[in-house]
Amino acid sequence: KIKTHPTQSSKIYRPLFDIESENCKFVDDNFFECISTADLLITSASTTCMEALAIGVPVAIIGAKSQILQNPIPKTIPDDYWRICYSSSELIGFSKSVINLNENELILESERIRDSYFLLPTNENIEELIHLNHQI
């Protein structure tokens, strides 16, 4: 499935790519519905990288050597689960390596990511965040 950014319509991109098939199609579904069934997220840079990793979906960030790279993934997250790809061959290579990932290890890493980088929006957590902002 190909999901465009929420501020853009897939109708803009469909005429540019002749890839509509049963195996590859543009969708306008909710991001979380799409990512929960994905095997790999391919993006240029977004907070969706961390959201995908947190639910056990590996991430490929498309980089361009002529542009500043915006990588939202902390260095503490093993690069077995994400990769910066500067060429189609790098993307294909990473896609193939994703197939061989140990699913149990991926689940454990996604749990570690959730525990380390995400908080439930409870009143207590929100108050703590507001308090931290006042100290800055």
Predicted regions and their residues:
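Residues within well-ordered alpha-helical secondary structure of globular protein domains
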Residues: 40, 97, 132-135
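Catalytic binding pocket for nucleotide-activated donors in carbohydrate/polymer assembly enzymes
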Residues: 4, 9-21, 47-118
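C-terminal alpha-helical cap of glycosyltransferases
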Residues: 118-136
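Active-site donor-binding acidic/aromatic loop of nucleotide-activated sugar
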Residues: 21-29
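Conserved glycosyltransferase catalytic-site signature
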Residues: 28-31, 45-47
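Short beta-strand elements in bilobed, periplasmic/extracellular small-molecule ligand-binding domains
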Residues: 1
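Acidic donor-binding loop of glycosyltransferase active sites
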Residues: 36-44
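Short acidic active-site motifs
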Residues: 29-33, 37, 90
